[in-house]
């Protein structure tokens, strides 16, 4: 419910403003059975899935079992293209406030949007340096913020930062800071 209030402002000019990636809830609530079957056939395919195995296992045995079970699954012909939609930049700060009686804590989010690292450069030393730099900055800031929560009168209950996707958009990144406030 709170997303319904803030997303139209945060994602103004984008398809995400009024629609989550799963689609319209009206469609989810009222679809015919065949639509669900078609959705499954369209999107549940080998190139969009992964298998994770965790534990003290015999790697060769598990790998053979996975290949036996999943190997026969064929990649469909003429697959649908997975689309990511752009999120425009904004010239002025965007302020969005949402209230909900079930939200028990006040939270403040601050996003600084930026373009993602170019896909074709993700195999370069530059990308490695970029990831190291953003990770180090986030780690140092998070350490400082955590230290503040240990003081006698911290300005917030908890806080943190990260550089990641801009909420649910893959075409825009954001350096995000969040603070859970006392009041």
Regions found by a protein language model. Give the residues of each.
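His/Glu-based metal-binding/catalytic segments typifying zinc-dependent metallopeptidases
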Residues: 8, 79-144, 178
């Amino acid at each position: 419910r709170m997303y319904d209030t803030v997303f139209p402002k945060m994602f103004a000019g984008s398809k995400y403003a009024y629609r989550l990636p799963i689609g319209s809830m009206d469609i989810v609530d009222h679809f015919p059975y065949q639509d669900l079957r078609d959705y499954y056939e369209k999107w549940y395919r080998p190139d969009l899935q992964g298998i994770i195995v965790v534990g003290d296992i015999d790697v060769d045995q598990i790998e053979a079992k996975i290949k036996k079970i999943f190997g026969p699954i064929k990649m469909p012909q003429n697959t649908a293209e997975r689309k990511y939609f752009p999120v425009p930049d904004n010239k002025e700060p965007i302020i969005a406030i949402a209230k909900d009686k079930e939200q028990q804590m006040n939270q403040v989010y601050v996003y600084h949007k930026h373009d993602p690292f170019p896909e074709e450069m993700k195999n370069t030393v530059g990308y490695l340096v970029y990831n190291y730099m953003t990770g180090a900055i986030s780690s140092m800031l998070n350490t400082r913020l955590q230290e503040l929560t240990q003081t006698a009168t911290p300005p917030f209950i908890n806080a943190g930062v990260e550089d990641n996707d801009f909420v649910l958009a893959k075409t825009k990144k954001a350096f995000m800071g969040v603070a859970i406030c006392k009041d």
